[in-house]
Amino acid sequence: MADSANHLPFFFGQITREEAEDYLVQGGMSDGLYLLRQSRNYLGGFALSVAYDRKAHHYTIERELNGTYAISGGRTHGSPAELCHYHSQELDGLVCLLKNPFNRPPGVQPKTGPFEDLKENLIREYVKQTWNLQGQALEQAIISQKPQLEKLIATTAHEKMPWFHGKISRDESEQIVLIGSKTNGKFLIRARDNGSYALGLLHEGKVLHYRIDKDKTGKLSIPGGKNFDTLWQLVEHYSYKSDGLLRVLTVPCQKIGGQTGNDSFRPQLPSAHPATWSAGGIISRIKSYSFPKPGHRKASSPQGNRPESLVSYNPYESDRGPWANEREAQREALPMDTEVYESPYADPEEIRPKEVYLDRKLLTLEDKELGSGNFGTVKKGYYQMKKVVKTVAVKILKNEANDPALKDELLAEANVMQQLDNPYIVRMIGICEAESWMLVMEMAELGPLNKYLQQNRHVKDKNIIELVHQVSMGMKYLEECNFVHRDLAARNVLLVTQHYAKISDFGLSKALRADENYYKAQTHGKWPVKWYAPECINYYKFSSKSDVWSFGVLMWEAFSYGQKPYRGMKGSEVSAMLEKGERMGCPPGCPREMYELMTLCWTYDVENRPGFVAVELRLRNYYYDVVN
């Protein structure tokens, strides 16, 4: 969460206020001397420590919901660095201008907090246990959903802590604290019925109770004390500083056999859990815990409805209280919750049919068409697999003239699709020869990206960034498999949910041999020229690098909410424009960094154009920065 500041030489990471003051003293305490540190109270926030009049002054920098940073009541900024630069020129509430940064001494790295140290392992274990993923499916889930998973882990980490006892009464909490050792500072936290919490603290043989309130914004605090985003941050703070309590927190109170309180809410502790509260930080005690499962992957059903029992935490929605999981309100799924994240044949009991031909008797079609084209129509259907009924999209070949070329095109597309298996690519279930040739594929209910964005202008930038990043992950996979798509456009990206995109339509796709890096077409066909790189138009040469050009156009479509590229221009006019070095302008409201990536994708010289490895990494880093 400190990624946006780690590169700054004056950023010290998660040091305490006292440590910051010590550093400023080392620097001479001259007016305007300053350093930046990570907030110990707010997720993704920072604190600015400034010397003035021989005293240290501290300002909290909160991360706003839109991803900007601001000192309370002050102007918002795109990054902590921009905020510091601004306050080097404008007071705007500070005691003095920022003049001299106090940089970290040589060899000193930003200090990571306990959660930062462990979050990679926590996320990996959480994804493994919650969605039962392994291998590439696990890695893809972590990469694409890391910001959401970080928030999920951070805001629910207290449920796995030894000091959190769930819903127990005040009397029960006193009994538990008084069992065993009577060490001063022994403590536990319990949940109260109104959504707040209470701290039980042992002092001189008596249990003191402190209320932990939760305000409308979700901030937690002991009355009169500091605000915190999470319970574990609150506990970490009061473990090194009493700050209004009679004493600091020392020893967490263990659950009795892991069976007290609300066991449906709280995971059972492993029997090997250590009984002592040794050095190493509060969070270090959750390494060996098993995570509760908020939901499982969506089960297939003919109706395509999501059972209430499978509803899981949705990090895209605002917090609705600590007991939101107990409510039956519908929440939107993460990609891993959907039935199309993994291949239907990932289940070893589901045997892939030989030569991918399906039994027509097991396929049911709806009458309503989802779409149509020169090839025929697409309908929604249901395919009876061995264990489940799977909702599918069926491309039905319209071949009244019995043209063998049309059948060959469909079979060629099927041949490409059967070789691909990635969460961000529409998978083929199989092909069916009956009243017509049919290509049976995974269903993406929300349809093409361009049409969805045209009809849903409320979709925010960070949601669009999330979707185009997923597309880049799918294209990186194609690049690694030596496939060229040749028809990458927003119309061929289908949405499973508002937060889950898949690449489709492999009718023009080609597999390259291991010794090839491009495909050369023999003739000019009915090509989507406005999405094509100059070398495709001029020399009929197609490669992953030409797909990168198309991806830049797709990004432009997405950030312009489904508008047509080069509107009103003919293909020849577009070619002339590109030859002159001109490119489409930045869509209104599009982040500067995203337009810069588009123009990089539109590099004329194919050798200097980035590949999808570089494009995906750049998108990933920006996505993490704006969503965190």
UniProtKB/Swiss-Prot annotation:
Residues 364-624 form the Protein kinase domain. It comes from Sus scrofa (Pig). The modification Phosphothreonine is found at T250, T338, T377, T523. One of its GO terms (molecular function) is protein tyrosine kinase activity. Autoinhibited. Intramolecular binding of the interdomains A and B (also called linker region) to parts of the catalytic domain keep the catalytic center in an inactive conformation. The phosphorylation of the interdomains or the binding of the SH2 domains with dually phosphorylated ITAM domains on transmembrane proteins disrupt those intramolecular interactions allowing the kinase domain to adopt an active conformation. Autophosphorylated. Phosphorylated on tyrosine residues by LYN following receptors engagement. Phosphorylation on Tyr-316 creates a binding site for CBL, an adapter protein that serves as a negative regulator of BCR-stimulated calcium ion signaling. Phosphorylation at Tyr-341 creates a binding site for VAV1. Phosphorylation on Tyr-341 and Tyr-345 enhances the phosphorylation and activation of phospholipase C-gamma and the early phase of calcium ion mobilization via a phosphoinositide 3-kinase-independent pathway. Phosphorylated on tyrosine residues in response to IL15. Shows high susceptibility to proteolysis. Residues 103-162 are annotated as: Interdomain A. It catalyses: L-tyrosyl-[protein] + ATP = O-phospho-L-tyrosyl-[protein] + ADP + H(+). Changing K395R: Loss of kinase activity. The modification Phosphoserine is found at S39, S196, S288, S290, S309, S312, S343, S372, S572. Belongs to the protein kinase superfamily. Tyr protein kinase family. SYK/ZAP-70 subfamily. One of its GO terms (biological process) is regulation of ERK1 and ERK2 cascade. Interacts with LYN; phosphorylates SYK. Interacts with RHOH (phosphorylated); regulates mast cells activation. Interacts with NFAM1 (phosphorylated); probably involved in BCR signaling. Interacts with VAV1 (via SH2 domain); phosphorylates VAV1 upon BCR activation. Interacts with GAB2 (phosphorylated); probably involved in IgE Fc receptor signaling. Interacts (via its SH2 domains) with CD79A (via its phosphorylated ITAM domain); the interaction stimulates SYK autophosphorylation and activation. InterPro entries: Kinase-like_dom_sf, Kinase_SYK/ZAP-70_inter-SH2_sf, Non-receptor_tyrosine_kinases, Prot_kinase_dom, Protein_kinase_ATP_BS, Ser-Thr/Tyr_kinase_cat_dom, SH2, SH2_dom_sf. This is Tyrosine-protein kinase SYK.
